[in-house]
Amino acid sequence: QLRLETLRIADNPETIFIFDRYIHSAIVYREAEGLNGNWVREINKNVPKSDLSFYIDITPEESIKRNTDTKFNIHYSISILKIVRDRYLFYTGKGELVFIDGMKDIDCIQRQIAEEIKRHL
């Protein structure tokens, strides 16, 4: 609640918010669990909408390989990660997310994200 209030206070045309995860994350993971994504959208209808959202695509196998952060200890099976990836690709196809190839080198990824941000400013 406090974060939402902070967003409302700071909501002006010159403010840029950068989130590491947002509504689409909740949607695709709930869909991977068999829930209806529209339900997730409905319960999040009062959350401020993003002007630009990215999906950084990597394979499920690469996701498991890169998941070395024991802070959160979040582990999903390959089968769930495949569904998650398919759902993200569905939303990129609908134009709700900007597709970024996460298998490319970090400099290339950074350039592509910066170009997309500049295009939307």
Residues covered by each model-derived region:
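Phosphate-binding/switch loop-helix module in NTP-utilizing enzymes
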Residues: 1-14
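A glycine- and Lys/Arg-enriched "phosphate-lid" helix/loop adjacent to the NTP-binding pocket
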Residues: 21, 26-86
